Amino acid sequence: MGLLECCARCLVGAPFASLVATGLCFFGVALFCGCGHEALTGTEKLIETYFSKNYQDYEYLINVIHAFQYVIYGTASFFFLYGALLLAEGFYTTGAVRQIFGDYKTTICGKGLSATVTGGQKGRGSRGQHQAHSLERVRHCLGKWLGHPDKFVGITYALTVVWLLVFACSAVPVYIYFNTWTTCQSIAFPSKTSASIGSLCADARMYGVLPWNAFPGKVCGSNLLSICKTAEFQMTFHLFIAAFVGAAATLISLLTFMIAATYNFAVLKLMGRGTKF
């Protein structure tokens, strides 16, 4: 069997659910981390410019924002590696499942790839043997995890629960900014509300962003409307919305990964009891 034909047969048996979930995971994490990082920076500038002139009032908030930004760096790195590992697991276990059902034989493709990788090693001497030994060590390390979907089911389930909390927390700043924007709309169109314009305020202390002794801590009336019209406020609001969408996409990808891994684990457990892959 030629290499092209082998690749075509391997693509037929590709784990499309894992491929879609991986793309969605990378897209969601990139959107959440990138937009979330910039939105936190914009929030810091808005607070120190309009809501408090005393640095001690928002010093704790800045420390929290910087801590979250460092967590974002780690989250992006972790999900990139874990998503790639889940994709590799999807290819491995899907091949094992389809071998049980007889859809295609992975050993044929394996032989073709092996011939391609190891071909011509005799002429390369010790260098070729060293490369083959390195590849064998990588395969040995991955083999401890790949082919064991039960491990990935447990880890992915725990990550899904944790990310569900992250998804819920990402909705909080969207809610705060939406309330502020709604208040600005009421100020811009006084006919829609019976309250006086001067009594319509956005109070950062009410949401726990600033301590209650912060001054002024809130912005009211036409001053608030001027803040809502700034490009900085609009950009930060939309960045938080984008981060929320990214968190939702990542949650969907984790659920897809978990369903696919659970299915593969069930098939291998129930129908492949006497088979080793």
UniProtKB/Swiss-Prot annotation:
Residues 37-59, 179-238 are extracellular. The gene is PLP1. Disulfide bonds join C184-C228, C201-C220. GO terms for cellular component: myelin sheath; plasma membrane. SMART domains: PLP (SM00002). PANTHER family: MYELIN PROTEOLIPID, MYELIN PROTEOLIPID PROTEIN. Belongs to the myelin proteolipid protein family. It comes from the Eukaryota. A lipid is attached at C6, C7, C10, C109, C141 (S-palmitoyl cysteine). Its main location: membrane. Keywords: Cell membrane, Disulfide bond, Lipoprotein, Membrane, Palmitate, Phosphoprotein, Transmembrane, Transmembrane helix. GO terms for biological process: axon development; central nervous system myelination. GO terms for molecular function: structural constituent of myelin sheath. Pfam families: Myelin_PLP (PF01275). This is Myelin proteolipid protein.
